[in-house]
Amino acid sequence: MQDVIFFLSKHILLISIWIFCFIAAVFFITRTLLSKSKMINNFQAIKLINQDKAIVVDTRSLESFKEGHILNSINVPLKNIFLGKIKEIEIYKMFPIILVLSDTYKVNACIKKFFEYGFNRVYILKNGLYYWKTDNLPLIVNDK
């Protein structure tokens, strides 16, 4: 027991770092498990689209949307979501929603808004369209 106390007294910085890392890990794991929404990868998204008729909501700007988007996705810019202008997707409340986000720092606020509007099954496409393109999955390009 004296050896443990001696070790702790000589290595306070090391022990502090370990305690901080442990608390951070517990926090992030708990937050992930208790989160109402779920981060999904491309193949989970494809499965949701094909089997559960999930609706893809692309929150990027109209210009970015026209440069390339997932087939049958609906463009609702992030600012419209925060302003409550979501008439295009209100009829899809009973379907799973897959969000394509470009601003990852607004993820939690965006998800909160969707739950406020009555959407119960909200998923986030991990890394937006970046990995979708990396995996060479199809994109629709509008030049209009």
UniProtKB/Swiss-Prot annotation:
Protein name (record): Uncharacterized protein BU052
Classification via Pfam families: Rhodanese
Matches recorded under PROSITE patterns: RHODANESE_3
Lineage: superkingdom: Bacteria
Domain Rhodanese: 50-140
